[in-house]
A protein has these predicted regions:
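RNA-contacting regions in translation and RNA-metabolism proteins
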Residues: 1-223
Length: 223
């Protein structure tokens, strides 16, 4: 381990993990066994050098492929991933088989599958698994999880959408330092604007006094 760089000797090849490919806050001690994703191979005079990563989206894809055997059979698949390593990952999944719940398949019984992935990347990194939708408005609404969305209007030409939420959901939709809406935007490919809608005030009619109602009824009968 060198300052800001993790270096791994692999026979004739050398693997390095730059700081940009590391999970923020993660400590790599000498002799520690870790899983990595081979992001690139650079050819040098001394031989090939492997660029390793634990902080990119492909690493999360690899980890789920180890935990979800249905990915190998093609029953379920990861459509898109957006990640800010060490903080949050959003995963859009789908199924090609009717009756198969893709989200439940990736979460696993009692959350065992997603928990195994979180154990590797660090439990401080939240993982949102959402169903992929071909309809952009539906997909955007799903991507805004955990916020509850009222409606979405999409401008296909501008690749922009407005997401309407109730006032109490606005901060959830935006997320800490804009993280939730930022990841949702990357996941869906649309620039997203969050608009809060005030709760509609119900028009309540004044309750009539029961004695007045009885008197009115008596008067009508008398007439």
């Amino acid at each position: 381990v060198e300052p800001r760089v993790v270096r791994v000797e692999l026979g004739k090849a050398t693997g390095i993990m730059p700081q940009s490919e590391q999970i923020p806050g993660e400590y790599y001690g000498v002799g520690r066994r870790i899983k990595v994703y081979i992001k690139d191979i650079e050819r040098e005079g001394r031989g090939p050098q492997l660029i390793l990563s634990r902080g990119n989206e492909e690493f999360v894809h690899y980890l789920f492929s180890q935990e979800v055997p249905e990915m190998e059979t093609g029953a379920v698949e990861i459509k898109k991933i957006a990640r800010e390593a060490g903080r949050r990952t959003k995963l859009a999944v789908s199924s090609v088989l009717p009756g198969v719940d893709p989200v439940g398949t990736f979460v696993g019984g009692h959350g065992t599958r997603v928990q195994a992935v979180m154990n590797e990347i660090g439990e401080q990194e939240k993982v949102d698994i959402i169903p992929y939708e071909d309809n952009p408005a539906d997909f955007i609404a799903n991507a805004m999880s955990p916020a509850e969305v009222l409606s979405v209007t999409v401008d296909e030409e501008a690749k922009r959408a407005t997401v309407y939420v109730s006032e109490d959901q606005q901060s959830v939709a935006i997320g800490r330092a804009g993280q939730n809406v930022r990841l949702a935007s990357r996941l869906t490919g649309y620039e997203l604007d969050i608009e809060a809608k005030a709760a509609a005030k119900s028009e309540t009619k004044p309750r009539k006094n029961i004695e007045d109602s009885l008197m009115n009824a008596v008067e009508e009968v008398a007439e």
